[in-house]
Protein backbone atom coordinates (compact mmCIF):
# COMPACT_ATOMS: atom_id res chain seq x y z
CA UNK A 1 0.00 0.00 0.00
CA UNK A 2 1.28 3.40 -0.92
CA UNK A 3 0.24 6.74 -2.22
CA UNK A 4 3.77 8.04 -2.20
CA UNK A 5 5.34 6.22 -5.12
CA UNK A 6 5.07 6.72 -8.83
CA UNK A 7 3.98 3.91 -11.10
CA UNK A 8 6.58 1.90 -12.96
CA UNK A 9 3.88 -0.18 -14.66
CA UNK A 10 2.47 1.00 -18.01
CA UNK A 11 -1.21 0.81 -17.01
CA UNK A 12 -3.06 2.10 -13.95
CA UNK A 13 -6.57 0.78 -13.38
CA UNK A 14 -8.21 3.29 -11.06
CA UNK A 15 -11.20 1.79 -9.29
CA UNK A 16 -9.82 -1.73 -9.64
CA UNK A 17 -11.89 -3.19 -6.80
CA UNK A 18 -15.18 -2.54 -8.62
CA UNK A 19 -16.79 -4.89 -11.10
CA UNK A 20 -15.48 -3.23 -14.28
CA UNK A 21 -12.06 -2.60 -12.77
CA UNK A 22 -11.70 -6.28 -11.92
CA UNK A 23 -12.65 -7.28 -15.47
CA UNK A 24 -10.02 -4.91 -16.85
CA UNK A 25 -7.38 -6.35 -14.51
CA UNK A 26 -8.26 -9.86 -15.63
CA UNK A 27 -7.93 -8.82 -19.27
CA UNK A 28 -4.53 -7.20 -18.61
CA UNK A 29 -3.36 -10.36 -16.84
CA UNK A 30 -4.45 -12.50 -19.79
CA UNK A 31 -2.29 -10.40 -22.11
CA UNK A 32 0.66 -10.19 -19.71
CA UNK A 33 0.41 -6.42 -19.42
CA UNK A 34 1.84 -5.16 -16.11
CA UNK A 35 -0.56 -2.91 -14.22
CA UNK A 36 -1.29 -1.06 -11.02
CA UNK A 37 -4.62 -1.84 -9.35
CA UNK A 38 -5.40 1.46 -7.63
CA UNK A 39 -8.19 2.74 -5.45
CA UNK A 40 -9.10 4.23 -2.09
CA UNK A 41 -8.98 1.07 0.03
CA UNK A 42 -6.04 -1.34 -0.08
CA UNK A 43 -7.97 -4.12 1.68
CA UNK A 44 -10.79 -4.04 -0.88
CA UNK A 45 -8.27 -3.93 -3.72
CA UNK A 46 -6.28 -6.91 -2.45
CA UNK A 47 -9.44 -8.90 -1.78
CA UNK A 48 -10.86 -8.08 -5.22
CA UNK A 49 -7.66 -9.14 -6.97
CA UNK A 50 -7.32 -12.42 -5.05
CA UNK A 51 -10.99 -13.39 -5.09
CA UNK A 52 -12.24 -12.10 -8.42
CA UNK A 53 -9.38 -11.99 -10.93
CA UNK A 54 -8.72 -15.47 -12.23
CA UNK A 55 -5.01 -16.29 -12.44
CA UNK A 56 -3.96 -13.10 -10.68
CA UNK A 57 -0.98 -14.92 -9.16
CA UNK A 58 0.57 -14.98 -12.64
CA UNK A 59 0.20 -11.23 -13.19
CA UNK A 60 2.81 -8.52 -12.84
CA UNK A 61 0.85 -6.02 -10.78
CA UNK A 62 0.88 -3.79 -7.73
CA UNK A 63 -1.96 -2.83 -5.43
CA UNK A 64 -1.86 0.84 -4.45
CA UNK A 65 -4.12 2.79 -2.13
CA UNK A 66 -4.37 6.42 -3.15
CA UNK A 67 -6.28 9.49 -2.03
CA UNK A 68 -8.76 10.87 -4.56
CA UNK A 69 -6.94 14.16 -5.05
CA UNK A 70 -5.29 15.52 -8.16
CA UNK A 71 -1.95 15.73 -6.34
CA UNK A 72 -1.95 12.13 -5.05
CA UNK A 73 -3.21 10.74 -8.36
CA UNK A 74 -0.62 12.73 -10.33
CA UNK A 75 2.14 11.26 -8.21
CA UNK A 76 0.79 7.74 -8.72
CA UNK A 77 0.31 8.15 -12.48
CA UNK A 78 3.85 9.41 -13.16
CA UNK A 79 5.70 6.74 -15.09
CA UNK A 80 2.54 5.09 -16.42
CA UNK A 81 1.50 5.31 -20.07
CA UNK A 82 -2.26 5.08 -19.65
CA UNK A 83 -4.91 5.30 -16.94
CA UNK A 84 -8.21 3.50 -17.20
CA UNK A 85 -10.65 5.20 -14.85
CA UNK A 86 -13.62 3.12 -13.69
CA UNK A 87 -14.61 5.38 -10.78
CA UNK A 88 -18.01 6.94 -11.34
CA UNK A 89 -20.15 8.81 -11.46
CA UNK A 90 -17.56 10.43 -13.70
CA UNK A 91 -19.09 13.92 -13.62
CA UNK A 92 -18.58 13.85 -9.85
CA UNK A 93 -15.26 11.98 -9.50
CA UNK A 94 -13.57 12.30 -12.89
CA UNK A 95 -12.05 15.77 -12.88
CA UNK A 96 -9.24 14.92 -10.45
CA UNK A 97 -8.29 11.87 -12.53
CA UNK A 98 -8.25 13.78 -15.83
CA UNK A 99 -6.22 16.64 -14.33
CA UNK A 100 -3.76 14.12 -12.87
CA UNK A 101 -3.35 12.42 -16.25
CA UNK A 102 -2.50 15.75 -17.87
CA UNK A 103 -0.02 16.60 -15.12
CA UNK A 104 1.59 13.14 -15.24
CA UNK A 105 1.60 13.11 -19.06
CA UNK A 106 -0.32 9.88 -19.51
CA UNK A 107 -3.27 8.91 -21.69
CA UNK A 108 -6.78 8.89 -20.21
CA UNK A 109 -9.54 6.36 -20.84
CA UNK A 110 -12.73 5.63 -18.94
CA UNK A 111 -15.86 3.54 -19.10
CA UNK A 112 -18.41 6.33 -18.80
CA UNK A 113 -21.85 6.34 -20.27
CA UNK A 114 -22.54 9.88 -19.01
CA UNK A 115 -23.24 12.19 -21.94
CA UNK A 116 -22.57 15.33 -19.90
CA UNK A 117 -19.13 13.99 -18.93
CA UNK A 118 -18.29 13.25 -22.57
CA UNK A 119 -19.20 16.82 -23.53
CA UNK A 120 -17.27 18.29 -20.60
CA UNK A 121 -14.15 16.34 -21.51
CA UNK A 122 -14.34 17.41 -25.14
CA UNK A 123 -14.94 21.08 -24.36
CA UNK A 124 -12.64 21.52 -21.37
CA UNK A 125 -9.85 19.02 -21.97
CA UNK A 126 -9.81 17.94 -25.62
CA UNK A 127 -7.50 20.68 -26.87
CA UNK A 128 -5.21 20.40 -23.84
CA UNK A 129 -4.75 16.65 -24.29
CA UNK A 130 -4.20 17.10 -28.03
CA UNK A 131 -1.60 19.83 -27.44
CA UNK A 132 0.22 17.50 -25.04
CA UNK A 133 0.11 14.64 -27.57
CA UNK A 134 -2.07 12.59 -25.23
CA UNK A 135 -5.11 10.43 -25.93
CA UNK A 136 -8.35 11.46 -24.23
CA UNK A 137 -10.74 8.57 -24.80
CA UNK A 138 -13.78 8.43 -22.53
CA UNK A 139 -16.77 6.17 -23.07
CA UNK A 140 -15.02 2.89 -23.76
CA UNK A 141 -18.03 1.09 -22.32
CA UNK A 142 -19.69 -1.51 -24.52
CA UNK A 143 -22.71 0.66 -25.25
CA UNK A 144 -20.54 2.98 -27.36
CA UNK A 145 -18.06 0.48 -28.74
CA UNK A 146 -20.49 -1.24 -31.12
CA UNK A 147 -21.47 2.02 -32.79
CA UNK A 148 -17.87 3.22 -32.98
CA UNK A 149 -16.75 0.01 -34.68
CA UNK A 150 -19.68 0.14 -37.10
CA UNK A 151 -18.93 3.79 -37.92
CA UNK A 152 -15.27 2.98 -38.58
CA UNK A 153 -16.26 0.10 -40.89
CA UNK A 154 -18.55 2.47 -42.75
CA UNK A 155 -15.76 5.03 -43.14
CA UNK A 156 -13.35 2.35 -44.35
CA UNK A 157 -15.76 0.81 -46.88
CA UNK A 158 -16.02 2.64 -50.23
CA UNK A 159 -19.60 3.22 -51.33
CA UNK A 160 -21.15 3.29 -47.86
CA UNK A 161 -22.49 6.71 -47.01
CA UNK A 162 -25.18 5.93 -44.46
CA UNK A 163 -25.09 4.19 -41.12
CA UNK A 164 -28.17 3.43 -39.04
CA UNK A 165 -27.54 2.13 -35.54
CA UNK A 166 -30.15 1.27 -32.93
CA UNK A 167 -29.17 0.19 -29.44
CA UNK A 168 -31.82 -1.01 -27.02
CA UNK A 169 -31.06 -1.38 -23.34
CA UNK A 170 -33.20 -2.69 -20.56
CA UNK A 171 -32.95 -1.88 -16.90
CA UNK A 172 -33.30 1.31 -14.98
CA UNK A 173 -31.37 4.57 -15.21
CA UNK A 174 -28.34 5.26 -13.06
CA UNK A 175 -28.66 7.98 -10.50
CA UNK A 176 -25.57 9.98 -9.54
Residue ranges and their predicted role:
Residues 1-8:
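A short, basic/flexible loop-to-alpha-helix module at the beginning of a structural domain
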Residues 9-32:
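N-terminal Rossmann NAD(P)H-binding glycine-rich loop of SDR-like oxidoreductase domains
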Residues 17, 40-42:
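Residues in the short beta-alpha loop(s) of Rossmann-like NAD(P)-binding domains
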Residues 34, 43-120:
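NAD(P)H-binding glycine-rich loop region in Rossmannoid oxidoreductase-like domains
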Residues 37:
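Short beta-strand "acidic-cap" motif of Rossmann-like dinucleotide-binding folds
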Residues 112-134:
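Rossmann-fold NAD(P)-binding glycine/threonine-rich loop
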Residues 141-143, 147-176:
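Conserved anion/nucleotide-ligand pocket segment
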Amino acid sequence: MSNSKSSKKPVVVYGASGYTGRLVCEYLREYNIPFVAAGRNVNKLESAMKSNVAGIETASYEVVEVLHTTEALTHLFKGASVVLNTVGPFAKFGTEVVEACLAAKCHYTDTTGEQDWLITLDQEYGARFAAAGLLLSPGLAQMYTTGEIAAQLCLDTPGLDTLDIAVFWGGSPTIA
